Design a protein with these regions (language model features):
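Membrane-interface segments at or immediately adjacent to transmembrane helices
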Residues: 215-285
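A diffuse structural propensity rather than consistent per-protein peaks
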Residues: 8, 136-146, 168, 255-256, ...
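Generic structural signal of hydrophobic/aromatic residues within well-ordered alpha-helices
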Residues: 42, 76-77, 156, 239, ...
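Transmembrane and membrane-interface helices of multi-pass
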Residues: 2-231
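Residues that form generic nucleotide/phosphate-binding pockets
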Residues: 132, 159, 187, 242, ...
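Alpha-helix initiation and N-capping motif
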Residues: 150-153, 233-236, 240, 307, ...
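Solvent-exposed soluble domains appended to multi-pass membrane proteins
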Residues: 270-278, 285-288, 293-645
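Short alpha-helical interface patches
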Residues: 10, 141, 149-161, 169-173, ...
């Protein structure tokens, strides 16, 4: 090994340029001056030193440089993307997996270039740039850059110039660190005796790294809400998990012929939308955030009835419980199941359809009603970018969309716009409709969103559990009581109108409450549950009410994917072909979600893969049709899944 230290005019020029650039950037980003001075000192030392290492130990020096680069790359990306609070949430194991993943990237580039300097330079810049892209994408739309975004990169680039982005001192720090790392690499001479041996070792180590990442990420889910993916999985790994979950395998027995065979049983002999007896009611759908009846988990007593009005509904009402596919979070999956009739049962755990699988115009109750002349409206009193609704709603076929800026933001309970404000907006839109306008409105509330641990001056807690006190549960129950009052106002208004109106109401999922409270209800909490006990955590109440005469019915259990079919049936609108399939499926498989299905034959909840006989055949047919609708663009059934007209 030889170390040479030589101060030259050219090196001094390089140093001066780097120091001035760092100082200027530091001035505009309010970075600490001691960081700038430290950078200048280290850079001065590196720019004037040259290390020549023994050829026989080249593999060792290369390994050290690559490992340092991988660690620095992962640390830099996490540091830029996360707040200090979120940064420390990432576990050591997750950090190790991300470093190994980054090392695999370095090794692949080394295999291609056979040059350690070039490899470290390219890999470190590429990974850091990748992190910067995610930072700007998050600032632009409120969620992270994922593999699915590559399909719509052109759209993003077309509007990105219209936005102003602000960078802070973190950018400078990681850039300075990257510059020092690259300078270190450039000052070290690493030569390999055999390029072939180096490439063989590189590919073998890459395989080992990839296998390690796979083995340690099999139980992890892609996270797509805000920056959960970065602090729970690490950004690099979360991006790779998104790639994994973007490719859904075709079910066994899938083919165009299999789809056509199933579809053949639901061919239309006349117009699918013959409405000679239809009332063409105004259809209002309310998906209420975290609205649940916790008594399905276990009995408990409160000081007053939580939802007295909803409990009293019976006349002209179909009501009961439906299985959601999510618990405590990931609202859009419930929204999607209702709208399309499809199920999370056949998609990867943790996936979010709105952000991963909607790239064209899926058939839904929205598109079906739009095709028969309905004006379709979506309302959500929160940010348009939440769960990518601003991109998804046009695909679904909504004519009008209303988000947080369209509501009175003084009507707040805790931190969110109230149910009553949303319902007032729905009533206002109804009153503005023309006499011959057929109207469909989907309202997604925000009032009851978790968490429930903070105290608020604008919220009076009126409902509480008798006995042991649980702060979050009491706040949640009080919120439900407020929702019930707003619901009563909505129903009362539409009882008084002459036009036919149908109101569909359901919760998206149960709330995420403390495990001690859940344990009080079911004796176990959230773990060690039987299939029946587990499904109880996924039950949400629903009803379909009309202001005209319909049969009063109770449903013990169904699932959200069937509610749009029930909505059309209660409106006396002829069912499209896919909904007719779902209506028959509902007779065989009364409820199905991401956790399993209800077996009529065995009178219990079971895992989908444990289905046998006729139940297995119907579930398989459902899986085949759903795959056709979501992933087979070339041979998608035009009978079952027509595009918007």
């Amino acid at each position: 090994m030889s170390i040479k230290f030589e101060i030259t005019k050219q090196n001094n020029i390089h140093f001066e340029i780097a120091a001035v650039a760092a100082a200027l950037v530091g001035y505009f980003t309010s970075a600490s001056w001691w960081v700038i001075l430290l950078f200048a000192a280290v850079y001065f030392g590196l720019v004037n030193v040259k290390l020549e290492l023994p050829v026989k130990l080249s593999w060792l020096w290369a390994a050290i440089l690559l490992v340092i680069g991988a660690i620095l790359s992962v640390f830099s990306v996490q540091y830029v993307l996360l707040t200090d609070e979120d940064f420390v949430k990432t576990t050591d194991m997750v950090c190790v997996v991300n470093v190994v993943l980054a090392l695999a990237i370095y090794l692949v580039i080394l295999f291609i270039t056979n040059n350690t300097r070039l490899t470290c330079t390219i890999a470190s810049i590429a990974i850091l740039a990748f992190g910067f892209i995610d930072y700007f994408v998050y600032e632009f739309r409120g969620n992270e850059f994922t593999y699915a975004d590559l399909k719509s990169a052109g759209t993003g680039l077309s509007v990105v110039t219209k936005y102003k982005f602000v960078i802070d001192y973190k950018f400078l720090y990681v850039i300075l660190a990257a510059v020092l790392y690259i300078m270190l690499v450039r000052r070290i001479e690493v030569q390999f005796e055999s390029a072939i041996h180096m490439r063989i070792i590189s590919i073998l180590l890459t395989i080992i790294c990839v296998l390690y990442v796979i083995m340690n990420s099999m139980s992890l889910n892609t996270e797509t809400w805000e920056k959960k993916g970065t602090y729970r999985n690490g950004y690099l790994l979360n991006f790779v998990l998104g790639i994994r979950d973007s490719f859904v395998k075709a079910p066994d027995g899938y083919s165009k012929a299999a789809v056509d065979k199933i579809a053949g049983n639901f061919k239309e002999t006349d117009s699918s939308y013959s409405q000679s007896d239809a009332k063409n009611p105004t259809i209002i759908v309310i998906m209420n955030e975290s609205f649940a009846d916790l008594s399905v988990v276990g009995d408990f007593e409160t000081n007053t009835q939580v939802t007295p009005f909803m409990d009293s509904l019976s006349e002209n009402t179909l009501k009961g419980y439906a299985l959601s596919s999510v618990y405590g979070a990931k609202t859009p999956n419930s929204e999607w199941e209702f709208e399309t009739g499809n199920s999370m049962a056949f998609l990867p755990d943790g996936s979010v359809v709105y952000q991963q699988y909607i790239n064209d115009d899926p058939t839904s109750i929205v598109s079906n009603l739009k095709n028969i002349g309905y004006t379709t409206v979506a309302m959500h009193p929160y940010y348009a970018t939440g769960w990518s609704r601003n991109k998804v709603y046009p695909h679904l076929g909504y004519d009008e969309t209303y988000f947080i800026d369209d509501f009175d933001q003084t009507k707040i309970l805790r931190e969110y716009i109230t149910d009553q404000e949303l319902y007032d907006k729905i009533i206002d839109r109804y009153e503005k409709k023309s006499d011959d306008e057929k109207l469909y409105i989907m309202g997604v509330t925000m009032q009851n969103h978790g968490g429930y641990g903070e105290r608020y001056d604008n919220f009076n807690q009126e409902v509480y559990k008798v006995g042991a006190s649980y702060t979050d549960a009491n706040q949640y129950l009080s919120l439900l009581n407020e929702s019930d009052k707003a619901l009563e106002n909505l129903i009362t208004y539409f009882k008084g109108v002459d036009d036919p109106v149908e109101i569909v109401f359901f919760g998206d999922h149960q709330p995420g409450l403390c495990n001690d409270f859940i344990k009080l209800l079911n004796g176990k909490g959230n773990s060690g549950l039987t299939e029946q006990e587990l499904e109880n955590l996924y039950k949400v109440p629903f009803f379909i009410w009309t202001n005209y005469e319909t049969d009063a019915q109770k449903v013990d259990v169904t699932s959200l994917n069937y509610l749009s079919t029930l909505t059309l049936e209660r409106a006396n609108i002829d069912l499209p072909a896919y909904n007719r399939f779902l209506a028959e499926l509902m007779e065989k498989i009364p409820a199905i979600n991401s956790r399993g299905y209800y077996s009529k034959k065995n009178e219990c909840f079971m895992h989908v893969e444990d289905a046998t006989g006729d139940e297995a055949k119907w579930i398989k047919a459902y899986n085949i049709l759903q795959y056709n609708s979501m992933f087979d663009e070339k041979d998608r059934s035009s009978l079952l899944f027509p595009y918007l007209k």
